[in-house]
């Protein structure tokens, strides 16, 4: 396993634990006398945007930039740099996005507003999933960790495409023109072998602002910027002189230990006041929970099984189908990514849709985490791998 992947797994695993704490604290505060302070702070405005908006559109753009950097590196020299390496997690990821969406639609086909959230259970929270896997220590084979990482990266790409195609509206032609010009500038700089990161960040800031005003979700600017950062330095090497790897190294701790926990804190604080058993067992939360806990493993495992049996892909060394099934359950931990999609899906909808969708996410993610851990623990050797 490369140093880059090892560092990634270590940071993401620890970050997953911080995420759990941040979400738990938010839930406690949202159901305490501090609830008004919590909601008031998030809804207060700074420079024309609410604090919650700055977190969801601003800080999360940095998170998506990191995704762009990681995906580019993995495609060029990492876990996805050959067809043989990429095909198995890619097939699994597609199955793991289609099946949860279909399960959700089966629960909510009669409600046109609820149908807008079809993509909510299609996402996987890589930090949370790796955090749960880390509890098993070195019993987990390296190849299984890399499979989860590759699957989650492809899953993230799918989420990015979904956001771009289905959760953008009221497009501004002028702002889009500026965004396209900024994007072109970034890739011309890359082609001309410009390696000064600060120049990319300046153009990236212009891109983010124009995308924010365009009607396309602003976080997509982060992905574009991440893909534009060059992997190799002036000397053509991608090790010590890589702008991409340097920026990835700088951003990773801030994303894992600040940005994602802040996002979880700002979005997981659900007030249970007025929430009844009847509402919790409604089609919206049940559809999300079932999509995450049932749809994810159904899609990932079925797609993986068919791919192996048909000879389209081979299982990585040291992994069997029992391991794949256990990991597929862990992938039902949608948490931050699912909450992010729900915040886009129900813009303008009654507040109950946001509340119940987040309850469904928390229910499905929690069950997936517990059951996934138990299954993985039982399928792995009792001693360290």
Swiss-Prot record:
Entry's transmembrane regions: 14-34, 49-69, 87-107, 117-137, 146-166, 171-191, 201-221, 250-270, 283-303, 324-344, 356-376
InterPro entries, A to Z: Na/H_antiporter_dom_sf, NhaA
Domain of life: Bacteria
Compartments where found: Cell inner membrane
Membrane topology type: Multi-pass membrane protein
Catalytic reaction(s) noted: Na(+)(in) + 2 H(+)(out) = Na(+)(out) + 2 H(+)(in)
Cellular component annotations (GO), alphabetically ordered: plasma membrane
A GO biological process held by the record: regulation of pH
One Pfam family named in its UniProt record: Na_H_antiport_1
Major localisation: membrane
Keyword line: Antiport, Cell inner membrane, Cell membrane, Ion transport, Membrane, Sodium, Sodium transport, Transmembrane, Transmembrane helix, Transport
Single Gene Ontology MF annotation: sodium:proton antiporter activity
Signal peptide (residue range): none
PANTHER family: NA(+)_H(+) ANTIPORTER NHAA, SODIUM ION/PROTON ANTIPORTER NHAA-RELATED
Protein's job: Na(+)/H(+) antiporter that extrudes sodium in exchange for external protons.
Similarity annotation: Belongs to the NhaA Na(+)/H(+) (TC 2.A.33) antiporter family.
The protein's name in its UniProt record: Na(+)/H(+) antiporter NhaA
Organism: Photobacterium profundum (strain SS9)
């Amino acid at each position: 396993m490369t140093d880059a992947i090892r560092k990634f797994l270590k940071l993401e695993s620890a970050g997953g634990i911080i995420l759990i704490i941040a979400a738990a604290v938010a839930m406690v505060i949202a159901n305490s006398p501090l609830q008004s302070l919590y909601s008031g702070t998030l809804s207060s405005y700074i420079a024309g945007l609410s604090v919650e908006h700055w977190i969801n559109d601003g800080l999360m753009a940095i998170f998506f930039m990191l995704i762009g950097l990681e995906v580019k590196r993995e495609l060029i020299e990492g876990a996805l740099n050959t067809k043989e390496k990429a095909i198995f997690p890619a097939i699994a990821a597609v199955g793991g996005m289609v099946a949860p969406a279909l399960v959700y639609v089966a629960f909510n086909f009669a409600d046109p507003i609820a149908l807008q959230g079809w993509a909510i259970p299609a996402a996987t929270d890589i930090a949370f999933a790796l955090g749960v896997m880390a509890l098993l220590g070195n019993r987990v084979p390296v190849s299984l960790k890399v499979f989860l990482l590759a699957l989650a990266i492809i899953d993230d790409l799918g989420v990015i495409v979904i956001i771009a195609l289905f959760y953008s509206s009221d497009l501004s032609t002028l702002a889009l023109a500026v965004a396209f010009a900024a994007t072109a500038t970034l890739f011309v700089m890359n082609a001309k072998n410009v390696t000064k990161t600060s120049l990319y960040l300046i153009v990236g800031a212009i891109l983010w602002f124009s995308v924010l005003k365009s009607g396309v979700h602003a976080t997509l600017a982060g992905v574009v910027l991440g893909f534009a950062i060059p992997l190799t330095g002036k000397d053509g090497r991608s090790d010590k002189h890589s702008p991409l790897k340097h920026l990835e190294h700088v951003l990773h701790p801030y994303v894992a230990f600040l940005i994602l926990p802040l996002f979880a804190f700002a979005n997981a604080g659900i007030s249970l006041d007025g929430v009844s058993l009847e509402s919790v067992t409604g089609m919206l939360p049940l559809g999300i929970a079932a999509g995450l806990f049932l749809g994810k493993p159904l899609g990932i495992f079925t797609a993986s099984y068919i791919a192996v049996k048909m000879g389209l892909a081979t299982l990585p060394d040291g992994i069997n189908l029992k391991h794949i099934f256990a990991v597929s359950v862990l992938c039902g931990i949608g948490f931050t990514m699912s909450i992010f999609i729900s915040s886009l899906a129900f813009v303008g909808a009654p507040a109950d849709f946001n509340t119940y969708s987040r309850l469904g996410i928390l229910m499905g993610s929690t069950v997936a985490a517990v059951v996934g851990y138990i299954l993985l623990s039982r399928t792995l050797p009792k001693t360290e791998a």
